[in-house]
Amino acid sequence: MNKSWLRSTIRSFEPYKVPEIKENIVINANESPYNIFDFPAVKDDFLARLAQTPSYHYPDPFAEELRAALADYVSCKPEEVLVGNGGDEIISLIINTFVNAGDTVLVHTPTFDIYGIDAEIVGGNVVSVPDLPGFKRDTKTFLAKVKELQPKLTMICNPNNPTGSILPVSYLEEVLQASANPVVIDEAYLEFSGQESIITKLGQYDNLIVIRTMSKAFGLAGLRLGYAVAQQDVIDALSLTKLVYNMNILTQAAGLATLAHRDDVLRHNVPPTIAARDYLYTELNKIDGVTAYPSVTNFVLLHVADGPAM
């Protein structure tokens, strides 16, 4: 293919590839080990919903019933929620809605790669603030960059992927107050942390956008159900770049069935995951040459001094 056909911003990109893994136990994708359809009540609810939803009809383009259920879960209004085909689509919608070519997008590193990739696709200028030694986030420099650059978007993964660290809500508020533009807080792993959501501050900040997902604590990664939470005018703006029918009837039904039994699902999934995480962290640090870092997520980042030897 003639590469001149491509947008100039992606000509140097390499295709995103997920490596083939032959092992039966896969832990590098931070997936849940629990199948939502192993819950009889959820499975029955899901099948009942599908039986009432003909496949020849297009899905509800705004997933109104699902928005209401998600709003009830996170304690906001339905009009403050927008659903997407996974958190990845929500990230893409945010960037496509707000970022022009040349606009600055501020991130901390290491973090979820998709923030920078999506920003570069539209020609954004990605500015990164690297962690301090020990994967401690450089909060002082990051806040200074927000004040200095006034980025078009500031993106914070909290808890962070891949380090597992979390920033307090008080610091996130400092960033929100310092920025005249949207600040995106990705809370994909929040259910494992025990910390309250920044969504509790939604009414105070018109520049706050929160990303949530049902992939991790609920175990719906294969069904792709992410959502944004923001004040209504921001949700309305994000809807301008959304595909009309972006969420199929299967995912909507699964999301509703899961949320109808959310307390049971979370009680089953989250405490054992936290216990396994803490056990793994402790045991890894007993191995010579291995350093595991504290985590509030469902994974543990580790450094191996001599990888080939291990």
How would you name each of these model-derived features?
Residues 97-156:
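PLP-dependent aminotransferase-like
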Residues 77-81, 102-104, 187, 206-207:
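Short acidic capping loops at alpha-helix termini that bridge into adjacent secondary structure
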Residues 120, 137-149, 162-183, 187-217:
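Active-site pre-lysine segment of PLP-dependent enzymes
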Residues 1-58, 150:
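N-terminal "arm"/small-domain region of PLP-dependent enzymes with the aminotransferase-like
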Residues 207-286, 291-293:
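PLP-dependent aminotransferase class I/II
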Residues 35-37, 225-232, 302-303:
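Short beta-strand-to-turn element immediately C-terminal to the catalytic PLP-Schiff-base lysine
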Residues 285-291, 299-310:
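Conserved C-terminal alpha-helix-loop-beta "cap" of PLP-dependent enzymes
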Residues 59, 71-93, 108:
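Short loop-beta-helix segment that forms the pyridoxal 5′-phosphate
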